[in-house]
Regions:
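Membrane-proximal, proline-rich intrinsically disordered regions
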Residues: 3-50
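TPR/TPR-like (Sel1-like) alpha-helical repeat modules
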Residues: 214-219
Length: 221
């Protein structure tokens, strides 16, 4: 026997697209963007993709990832370390794009906090594109939020990517806190962004700019 009334479900397992437009949603989105760094730091894939092939790190006698150290034909896009990092970083980048685009219309947060969240998003986006540039060269440089599946992909250039990374970090630095607050520990700080900017300049062969940023950082800490 069927029910007499229409069942209206209160779905709590999914977050609507408008949630990020709220004060709590913007803060939660920023936390979600940070979580995408888990694919790189303190993980096997981060080690495999960064220092395999050097004297610092090598494979053992056993294990299924030895080919990443010897660059065999098994080292391709089907590799879990590559696909997981790629997917997680682009999810993080898209979240950052949403934060940057939507923050201005969010109510219930002070302008200072909104500026800080945008600065954090720009740092994370710059960080991810820097790692992707090191690993893959030119990639799809997405700077706006993607809200629907798309097959429209365009490969950018390393020069354009470095220019955007430098722009993001330069814009983020003034709005980041000088040091972490004990009550809100773990957020990116101004010195962290300055350190990354100095490193990016170094990789982009802008040695004078790198020295200037890093010397200022050293003298201020």
């Amino acid at each position: 026997q069927s029910c007499n009334d229409l069942l209206t479900e209160n779905v709590v397992s999914r977050i609507g697209n408008d949630y990020i437009n709220t004060a709590k949603g913007l803060n939660d989105a920023t936390s979600a963007a940070y979580s995408s760094m888990r694919s790189w730091y303190g993980t096997e894939r981060g080690m495999n993709l960064s220092i395999f092939g050097t004297d610092s790190y090598t494979n053992g006698a056993d294990g299924s990832w030895k080919f990443m150290n010897t660059y065999t034909t098994d080292f391709d896009t089907r590799n879990g370390s590559i696909s997981e990092l790629w997917n997680d970083f682009y999810l993080g980048i898209n979240t950052c794009n949403a934060i940057i685009e939507r923050s201005a219309k969010v109510t219930g947060l002070s302008d200072a906090i909104k500026k800080q969240r945008v600065a954090e998003a720009k740092f994370i986006r710059a960080h991810h594109y820097f790692i992707l540039t090191q690993l893959f060269g030119g990639v799809d440089l997405r700077l706006t939020e993607t809200v629907a599946p798309t097959k429209d992909v365009k490969r950018s250039t390393v020069a354009a990517q470095y220019a955007q990374i430098i722009k993001d970090l330069s814009e983020a630095i003034p709005d980041l806190e000088a040091k972490s607050k004990s009550a809100d520990f773990g957020r990116v700080t101004r010195p962290a962004a300055e350190h990354l900017l100095g490193k990016v300049y170094l990789y982009d062969n802008k040695f004078v700019d790198s020295a200037n940023v890093l010397e200022t950082l050293i003298s201020s800490t």
